Structure formats: structure tokens, C-alpha cells
A protein has these predicted regions:
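Mg2+/Mn2+-dependent nuclease catalytic core
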Residues: 28-57, 200-314
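Short, amphipathic alpha-helical segments that act as regulatory/interfacial helices
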Residues: 124-135, 263, 267
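A non-catalytic, helix-rich entry segment at domain boundaries
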Residues: 130-207
Length: 326
């Protein structure tokens, strides 16, 4: 029996019309008036998106990614992205994943909470400044005192208004932590980067590159990336998971999800295959440069959660009545 070779498409934008238990029925804008079938709910391919299909509405924009087309013209995508022009922040999406589980409600809870000028956020900003100083140090070693003076010039209001720093003991602990992160970044950039297992070249790096990924409907900013996109680092000044395994420190779930999404962004926006990427989580507290790996099934689960958030946002706008939001 002759095997028919399936056609493959990287990305396809379609309009949703309706669905049944096995297929979506869609139209390709500006092509023709033909209705196409999209197979969903296939185990190991796109089953992660099945429970969102009832949330789709007529005329919704969908991105179909990594699509195979069989001999009958039926589309079978690996990703189904609802309203991809709604660019969700990667950090906000990753925060839906907590130690106790994940839920789209975490996204809305975070949006309703006031933004606090808290110690962890301030420490993270200062740690990013330390990274800048060590990466761009050209022939001289950054001085801690001079760098902290720069931090005071850059964050004067935040430092003055942080309630945690009004207590003398907490203030001392904060600046002790600043010194610790400075020293750890010094060791990481000057020594760990040069180790054979990492091979990181700070002279050919970009700090804080921003990306918009329309295929997946997300956007974000990395902390460190090699110019050839072979390697990137996401830095965290907080604690890792110290409890799941008593013998080692592991990345927290939200941090791990963040890395998955950055890998997907580089693949779909920059055509950099995830198999060739070397992503690392840098926990400056320890310090620990942790290699992060992923499976596409995990990424699909995160994008599926994104779809549920987008569907809720659009539902609130379209209904605009308390009977829907109660």
C-alpha cells in the first residue's frame, strides 16, 4: 500500500465558524469561501486544546501551528492559539503556575492585586543592574560601592518608599543580600561562564532583548542572550524550590514555565529550533545556573491555559453584564 506524504504548514491564520466532537470548521481569510476541517483532540498531538473548544465563538481568530494536511485536506495542528493578536505577557502567564497547581484564575487575581513596592521586586531590579555592570565591564572590575550608588540614582523613590527598609534590621539584611548577589554574579560571569559545559561569551551577548510572538500570542523580555540565539539566561534573585528534593535545588514551576515559553518564542518568531537552544535559569542566591529543558506537550498545556484566559477576557467584553462575571 502506497503511503501518501502529508503536506506541512508552519503557521496558518483562520476564522472559526463552529465545531463538533472531532473537528473545527474554519475559513481562511482572503483566500476563498471554502470551509475547512481542523482535527482536534488527537492524543499526543493536540489533545491539550480539546476542553477550550466550547469557549470559541463564531468569527474568532485562530493560529494553527505545525499543521499537517492529509490527503482529504483536513488540517491537523500541534497548536491552536485563540486570538493571537492578544499578546499576553510571558511573566504574567507563568505566574498562573504555583506550587499547588495552575489555574487561569491566578492571572485575574494578580491583575486585581495592587502592585507593591516590595523588597523582592526591588532586590530583583538591583540584581539586574549588577548583571549589566558585570557583562559590560570592559577591562575593569565593577566596584560594589559605585554600583550601589548607581542603584540609588536609578531607584531613588523605590528605595526611599520601601516599607521593609524602614526597619534597621531588615535594612541591613537587604543590603547584605545585595552584596551577596553582587559577589555571586561576579563569580558566575567571570568563572562559570567560561566553563566548558556552558561556553558563554559575554562579549557577544545582548541584555534584555524583547520579543513579540504573534504565532503564540505572547510577548516577553529575556535577561541575557547570545547574539546567535544559541543560549539564553533568565535570572532570578529569589529562592528556587528547596523542598521537592532534599538532595538538590530545583527550579520553581513558574520559573520553569517561563523558560518553556521563551524557548517557544525563539522557535516560532526567530526560527531557532528548540532542540538547538541552551536555556539556563540563573538563581543568583545560590548561585545556580540550571539547564532547562522542555517537551512540546508542556508548551501546549501552557498555551491552552492562555486560551482560557483570552476566552474569559473576550467573554467579559462581549457580554458586559454582571450575570456573566458573577
Amino acid at each position: 500500500m502506497k503511503r501518501v506524504k502529508m503536506e506541512k504548514i508552519r503557521r496558518l491564520r483562520v476564522l472559526f465558524f463552529y465545531s463538533d466532537k472531532a473537528y473545527l470548521y474554519v475559513e481562511i481569510p482572503e483566500k476563498d469561501d471554502q470551509i475547512y476541517q481542523v482535527r482536534y483532540g488527537i492524543s499526543g498531538v493536540n489533545e491539550e486544546f480539546s476542553d477550550q473548544i466550547p469557549l470559541f465563538w463564531r468569527g474568532a481568530n485562530l493560529n494553527l501551528l505545525d499543521v499537517t494536511i492529509d490527503e482529504k485536506g483536513v488540517f491537523c495542528p500541534s497548536f491552536i492559539v485563540l486570538e493571537p493578536d492578544y499578546l499576553m505577557d510571558i511573566s504574567s502567564l507563568a505566574e498562573c503556575y504555583r506550587d499547588y497547581g495552575s489555574h487561569p484564575g491566578n492571572y485575574f487575581m494578580s491583575r486585581l492585586m495592587p502592585i507593591e513596592n516590595a523588597r523582592p521586586l526591588l532586590l530583583g531590579n538591583i540584581a539586574n543592574l549588577f548583571l549589566d555592570e558585570w557583562i559590560y565591564a570592559d577591562g575593569h572590575l565593577p566596584d560594589y560601592r559605585a554600583t550601589m550608588q548607581k542603584a540609588f540614582r536609578q531607584y531613588p523613590v523605590e528605595l526611599a518608599a520601601c516599607e521593609d527598609l524602614l526597619d534597621a534590621q531588615k535594612e541591613k539584611a537587604f543590603f547584605d543580600d545585595c552584596r551577596m548577589h553582587f559577589d555571586h554574579l561576579s563569580d558566575t560571569v567571570q568563572h562559570t561562564f567560561d566553563e566548558a559545559v556552558y561556553r558563554l561569551d559575554k562579549s557577544d551577548a545582548v541584555l534584555e532583548p524583547s520579543y513579540i510572538c504573534e504565532p503564540l500570542g505572547i510577548q516577553g523580555r529575556l535577561d541575557y542572550m547570545q547574539r546567535d540565539m544559541s543560549c539564553f539566561i533568565e535570572m532570578k534573585s529569589g529562592k528556587a524550590d528547596e523542598y521537592s528534593d532534599k538532595n538538590k535545588v530545583l527550579p520553581k514551576e513558574n520559573n520553569r514555565v517561563q523558560m518553556l515559553l521563551y524557548m517557544a518564542v525563539l522557535e516560532f518568531s526567530m526560527n531557532c529550533p528548540h532542540e538547538k537552544q541552551r536555556p539556563y535559569l540563573l538563581y543568583t542566591r545560590y548561585p545556580l545556573l540550571y539547564p532547562a529543558r522542555t517537551t512540546w506537550a508542556q508548551v501546549r498545556k501552557v498555551i491552552a491555559l492562555r486560551n482560557r484566559i483570552v476566552a474569559s477576557e473576550y467573554g467579559a467584553q462581549m457580554h458586559n453584564h454582571e450575570s456573566y462575571t458573577e
